[in-house]
């Protein structure tokens, strides 16, 4: 077994069917790779706020970083399907694993796509100041994180990972309000500002995230490795 410990953070909200398939699949998958791991389901509460993926990732990392050496940010609706290529072993460089995903025709979505499944060491995550807390809902926060790593002089490598996509309803940005396109436009603008050096990532991320832990518990009675955080 490798000595480095892996923390898998799953940003989550209202995907119970996906989660029920994801957890047992991933637990078996990582065990077969002989990796010391833990899985953290980081959920934002239905508190009337817009979904903020970056903040709950940052919260999860802050709460569990002392028990790991490297971190994998993993979407709950993607499960690995190729044992040869979906390798979660430790690397000294950032690694993007989800390069061949079913929903994108098992092809790379775009050259700047770092979403789905990405890994890096804890030190790299901290140097990049984690994820931005300013993106609303889904969209562009993963590209922003890739840009952060690159601005820290890290080269992101891709493993030829093949992932199946679990069926799910359309992303729900808010528990009560309909989708607001202006928020996605705001995300795009923020991402371009990051790329162009107009946004200082050192002032937005791990060091500015604010949260309150509502619940912290095991998600499986059969395993100590899988835990759940409910965050406000």
Placement of each model-derived feature along the sequence:
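Conserved donor-nucleotide/metal-binding helix-loop-beta segment in metal-dependent transferases, i.e.
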Residues: 82-106
